Regions:
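Structural motif
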Residues: 15-23, 114-121, 254-258
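Extended mid-to-C-terminal alpha-helical interaction segments
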Residues: 196-288, 293-298
Length: 311
């Protein structure tokens, strides 16, 4: 089961007993389906939970004659599509008009009379998500969207979302394949919206996943930093060893000044040791910068005096 399906399952488990709240939820489901008119009501979904929720709401509120169909989404897939159809046209007309829409009305807008309180708005948005909402797996990305069939409805939905007082939401929009997408990519806003419409468990799951990602990223950054440092140490050490070997072959290490001679022998014995550790292991310990300064002098000696004395 996908994360989006889990969200819809949780939303469908919300207990609601007030008739107006049930009606607002049903309104959200029907209005944002692609077939809601005075002559035809058809609801298609991949979620069996959403399909059964719609049937429950219709039967409790209007008792229409309903047919539920089920079919495989594709021949090569195990996922199914569920279609709930209100059979009788008189039932369609009765339901359509009860939500304040006029018989034969083609262009639908959100009738705000059905969203007269915060509780009704919550129920309405719960229905909208069950109808056209989806959310990505938080392990992959943060993305929640509503795929809205009409431009006017997408604009109305954005307004409803933006006016929620319990959380601050800033929906974005884009047109995709003839549909109007209202979406969120900020994890905080997604969690707030899920909690608002009745899916706090999934909201907590997203927050937990985000925390795990942050820990992993911090660990990876630390590991990458350590690997990079090891690489730098190895490169610098190889350069120093080459210079010392060159001195050894030409004028001899014992010809070096005492401070350079000591660190040269220590480097030969400890090719993987960091500059900090080299400095601490000298007869008179010095800092990392002090050890680095001696190594730079050693490299300069190998590049200048060795060439002169080695002719």
């Amino acid at each position: 089961m996908s994360f989006s399906s889990d969200v819809k399952k949780e939303i469908c488990s919300v207990e609601q007993f007030e008739r107006e709240a049930l009606k607002a939820e049903l309104y959200g489901m029907l209005l944002f389906s692609r077939n809601f008119s005075s002559k035809k009501i058809t609801f298609t979904t991949e979620s069996n939970y959403a399909g059964n929720r719609l049937i429950f709401l219709l039967q409790n509120l209007y008792m229409p004659i309903i047919e539920k169909q089920s079919a495989l989404r594709t021949k090569s897939s195990d996922s199914r599509l569920y279609k709930i159809i209100v059979i009788d046209e008189n039932d369609c007309k009765r339901i359509f008009e009860d939500f304040g829409h006029i018989y034969g009305q083609v262009t639908l807008r959100v009738n705000r009379a059905n969203l007269s309180s915060e509780e009704l708005t919550q129920s309405f948005l719960r229905g909208v998500f069950l109808s056209c909402g989806s959310i990505s797996d938080p392990m992959k990305s943060y993305h929640l969207e509503f795929c809205v069939p009409h431009k006017n409805l997408s604009q109305d939905l954005c307004k409803v979302l933006s006016e929620i007082t319990e959380c601050t939401l800033a929906p974005k929009t884009v047109v995709r394949s003839g549909s109007y997408i209202v979406y969120f990519k900020e994890s905080e806003q997604i969690c707030d919206l899920l909690t608002y419409i009745g899916a706090p468990i999934r909201a907590m799951e997203i927050m937990g996943t985000k925390a795990i990602k942050q820990v992993r990223n911090n660990v990876n950054r630390r590991i990458n930093g350590e690997v990079a440092n090891i690489g730098k140490i190895a490169t610098a050490s190889a350069k120093q060893l080459d210079a010392i070997e060159h001195i050894k072959r030409t004028v001899g290490i014992d010809s070096l000044p005492e401070d350079l001679r000591e660190i040269a022998y220590l480097r030969l014995e400890n090719p993987d040791m960091s500059l900090r550790d080299l400095g601490q292991n000298l007869s008179t310990p010095i800092s990392r910068s002090g050890a680095n300064h001696r190594m730079q002098r050693l490299l300069e000696y190998a590049g200048t005096e060795v060439k002169t004395n080695g002719k």
